[in-house]
């Protein structure tokens, strides 16, 4: 049982009974052994009265379903690698403010600075998720760590006012999605404080599962900032080998004894823990609208290349010919989603170029490495999935030589995300590469200009390094 914090609110005996009664009796997916969840409940800013209710509900849900065991804490030492590694998932429970920054009391017994300690804690959380840990966010977890850009992208967005605290309509965006199966209808109504989000929130990066129903909700409220009517309520994503689930419901205490929402949160937690399989490709990727075929097994009219260097083989794949060289799109692209499949031969060394200059691709463009490095532990900045010489992949998602891989490259301004076989392996802001020949971690790179200064518009292309490689189902969706 987790301790109940009176200072943040109190879970009364009556509320405890309501929470217990609302919990699902079993897991969505049975597990051989309960997972271990760390429930992080430190708030630096506004203290939600529902913090102990979220912790209590998470613990009781694990007990009733047998799917996990929960431990609540506000001790920042628990986020250190040696402690966090004891858990399978991390629940960010209605936190607010810069909780990743150590307080004076956290520095007792330490000889380093707050800045150095925070750097260790940041790296620990990111590495935990990239290595396969689950991240679960309740409500105001998005009202946290505004000074830590990578956290904003990891959790999916930042809070930008709550225009509604009343009954509102909810749209279940994908009723047939595995996480949506708990809902009996495509729309329902609920009362809670409802957030709107700002950057880095984007459907280019997230699979949005629930949104505000603007047709049945009062849209004349103050503080409505979004003009696109995209008011997300819940989403999922991947990060390396890890998974992220966020649900914005949970300001009001009674959310944690709403049976339908608790079933949904159970499934979201099991998804984040890796026990429930669900497609997390971003909503903009799976939305078929706006795509243009660059190669679909037929003609190569969209491309320019040396005659005989590339051709369509008998299986309808784009294949490398003798002395092929580079192959480039005729059009240049700035912001886009590039979706393709590739197959590498043994010892293959190729690459997917974007925002590149065909006349100087090595220094005038970006490359995602295509290489036969499947199974390699701790891949580096020259292995499959690397942003070549600039950023190692978060995880090795490459399939063995001879098998088809699916790669999605998403570029929007300075943000570059690469998804390989369903796993986000690059999630970078190239504005952080502000020094020529140097990466943000202090390591060297080949570039004579800072990556942030490279052109934001250029051609798409594939590289020939003399070993067989095949591409198919290549399409692009221009973005604003």
Report residues per predicted region.
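Extracellular ligand-binding/catalytic regions of CAZymes and related secreted enzymes
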Residues: 2-32, 52, 63-65, 74, ...
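Catalytic beta-strand/loop cores that center a nucleophilic Ser/Cys/Thr
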Residues: 14-22, 157-240
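Short beta-strand segments enriched in small/hydrophobic residues
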Residues: 34-45
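Short alpha-beta junction capping motif
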Residues: 37, 84-145, 241
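Solvent-exposed loop/turn segments at secondary-structure junctions
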Residues: 43-46, 76-78, 95-99, 135, ...
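Glycine- and acidic-residue-enriched helix-capping/strand-helix junction motifs
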Residues: 44-56
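A short, well-structured beta->alpha microelement
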Residues: 66-80
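Carbohydrate-interacting regions of secretory-pathway proteins
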Residues: 151-153, 157-166, 170-172, 188-189, ...
């Amino acid at each position: 049982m987790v301790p109940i914090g009176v200072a943040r609110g109190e879970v009364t005996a009556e509320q405890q009974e309501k929470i217990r009664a609302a919990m699902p009796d079993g897991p969505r997916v049975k597990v051989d052994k309960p997972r271990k969840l760390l429930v992080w409940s430190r708030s630096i800013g506004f203290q939600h009265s529902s913090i102990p209710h979220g912790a209590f509900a998470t613990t009781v849900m694990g007990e009733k379903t047998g799917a996990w065991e929960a431990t609540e804490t506000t001790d920042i030492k628990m986020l250190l690698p040696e402690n966090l590694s004891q858990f399978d998932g991390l629940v960010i429970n209605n936190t607010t403010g810069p909780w990743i920054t150590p307080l004076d009391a956290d520095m007792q017994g330490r000889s380093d600075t707050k800045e150095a300690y925070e750097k260790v804690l940041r790296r620990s959380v990111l590495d935990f998720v990239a290595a396969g840990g689950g991240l679960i966010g309740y409500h105001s977890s998005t009202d946290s760590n505004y000074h830590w850009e990578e956290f904003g992208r990891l959790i999916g967005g930042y809070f930008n006012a709550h225009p509604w605290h009343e009954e509102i309509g909810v749209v279940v965006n994908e009723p047939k999605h595995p996480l949506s199966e708990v809902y009996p209808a495509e729309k329902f109504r609920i009362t809670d404080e409802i957030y709107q989000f700002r950057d880095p929130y984007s459907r280019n990066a997230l699979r949005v599962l629930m949104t505000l129903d603007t047709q049945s909700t009062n849209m004349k409220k103050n503080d409505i900032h979004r003009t696109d009517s995209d008011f997300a309520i819940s989403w999922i994503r991947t990060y390396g080998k890890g998974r992220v689930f966020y649900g914005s419901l949970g300001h009001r205490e009674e959310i944690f004894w709403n049976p339908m929402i608790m079933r949904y949160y159970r499934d979201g937690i099991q998804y984040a823990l890796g026990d429930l399989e669900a497609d997390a490709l971003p909503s903009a990727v799976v939305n078929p609208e706006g795509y243009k075929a660059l190669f679909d097994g037929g003609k190569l009219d969209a491309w320019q290349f040396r005659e005989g260097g590339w051709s369509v083989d008998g299986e309808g794949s784009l294949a490398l010919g003798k002395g092929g060289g580079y192959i480039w799109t005729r059009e240049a692209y700035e912001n886009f989603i590039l979706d393709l499949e590739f197959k590498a031969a043994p010892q293959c060394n190729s690459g997917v170029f974007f925002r590149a200059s065909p006349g100087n691709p090595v220094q005038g463009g970006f490359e995602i490495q295509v290489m036969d490095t499947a199974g390699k532990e701790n891949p580096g900045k020259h292995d499959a999935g690397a942003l070549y010489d600039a950023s190692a992949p978060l995880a090795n998602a490459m399939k063995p030589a001879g098998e088809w891989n699916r790669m999605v490259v998403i570029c929007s301004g300075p943000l570059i995300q690469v998804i390989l076989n369903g796993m986000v392996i690059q999630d970078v802001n190239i504005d952080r590469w502000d020094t020529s020949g140097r990466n943000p971690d202090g390591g060297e790179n080949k570039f004579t200009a800072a990556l942030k200064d490279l052109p934001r518009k250029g051609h798409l292309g594939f590289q020939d390094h003399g070993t067989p490689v095949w591409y198919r189902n290549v399409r692009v969706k221009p973005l604003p």
